[in-house]
């Protein structure tokens, strides 16, 4: 369980930090839930990069 210290009674900031750390922990766990071969990992990384670029270049 991630821990965050509350400084000067700033609970809202501490809560945001906690949520960020907790989501990273969950994401990391899901990423390492099972072993991926090197090539499969590379293809997934390339797919995520393409998706990220398409999202960046969308016109609203």
Curated annotation (Swiss-Prot):
One of its GO terms (biological process) is translation. The keyword Ribosomal protein applies. GO terms for molecular function: structural constituent of ribosome. Keywords: Ribonucleoprotein, Ribosomal protein. InterPro entries: Ribosomal_bS21. Pfam families: Ribosomal_S21. The keyword Ribosomal protein applies. Residues 38-60 are annotated as: Disordered. GO terms for cellular component: ribonucleoprotein complex; ribosome. Belongs to the bacterial ribosomal protein bS21 family. This is Small ribosomal subunit protein bS21. The gene is rpsU.
